[in-house]
């Protein structure tokens, strides 16, 4: 059980950082994709 807890403690900051990065990057990425397809 404590192995699962340690894995969660390790993954939680990674997931939070990934979610934060996606939240910041996604709008710009969507604009790039839209401009790519509108050519």
From Swiss-Prot:
Subcellular localization(s) per the UniProt record: Cellular thylakoid membrane
Annotated InterPro entries: PSII_PsbY
Transmembrane regions listed in the UniProt entry: 7-25
GO molecular function: manganese ion binding
GO cellular component entries: photosystem II; plasma membrane-derived thylakoid membrane
Predominant place of localization: membrane
A Pfam family per the record: PsbY
Keywords assigned by UniProt, alphabetized: Membrane, Photosynthesis, Photosystem II, Thylakoid, Transmembrane, Transmembrane helix
Recorded topology in the membrane: Single-pass membrane protein
GO biological process: photosynthesis
Domain of life: Bacteria
Subunit relationships: PSII is composed of 1 copy each of membrane proteins PsbA, PsbB, PsbC, PsbD, PsbE, PsbF, PsbH, PsbI, PsbJ, PsbK, PsbL, PsbM, PsbT, PsbX, PsbY, PsbZ, Psb30/Ycf12, peripheral proteins PsbO, CyanoQ (PsbQ), PsbU, PsbV and a large number of cofactors. It forms dimeric complexes.
Record family assignment: Belongs to the PsbY family.
Job of this protein: Loosely associated component of the core of photosystem II (PSII), it is not always seen in crystals. PSII is a light-driven water plastoquinone oxidoreductase, using light energy to abstract electrons from H(2)O, generating a proton gradient subsequently used for ATP formation.
Cross-referenced HAMAP family: PSII_PsbY
Protein name as annotated: Photosystem II reaction center protein Y
Gene: psbY
């Amino acid at each position: 059980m404590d192995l699962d807890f340690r894995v969660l403690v390790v993954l939680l900051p990674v997931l939070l950082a990934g979610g934060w990065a996606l939240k910041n990057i996604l709008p710009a990425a969507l604009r790039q994709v839209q401009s790519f397809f509108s050519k």
